Amino acid sequence: MANDSAPRVSKAVHRPNETCTAIVADSEVQSLMWGEMNYRWPQHENITVKFIDGTEEQHKLAWKRFQKIDEYVNLTFVFVDEGDSDIRVSFAEEHSHYSYVGIGNRSVPQNKKTMNLGLKVYDNDVEWDRVALHEVCHAVGFLHEHQHPKNGIPWDERKVINY
């Protein structure tokens, strides 16, 4: 049975110019739906976003992707410079990108990041769209399609990861 109080993290290992194939490494994933209702934000919610490191240019490039998703959901992303925030974005060079899923972001201590975008200003727009839009969708509450319990695909996770 899923532990509804535990925040979920979606993590993708960064392999330039490849699509995300990583999955939530979580034994509870079978109980989740693509957009898990328990992790979706309340409708019309203001979701505060803070950049905890990175350059001004990285902030602009990332914020552009938050605004793009903002157009399609009935949520509003609000940038904050200081104080508490719902989503805390880092640009750490971890060779991975990840985000907590939906309101799971609020379970993370304020001194910890909830999203990592290992992107640089010299990465092209296609890469910024591919990675940042993907992670912002996780922050909204969406999971990967292959994690839907009714996908009917018998995944061999080890083979997929080793591919």
Regions found by a protein language model. Give the residues of each.
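Zinc-dependent metalloendopeptidases
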Residues: 1-163
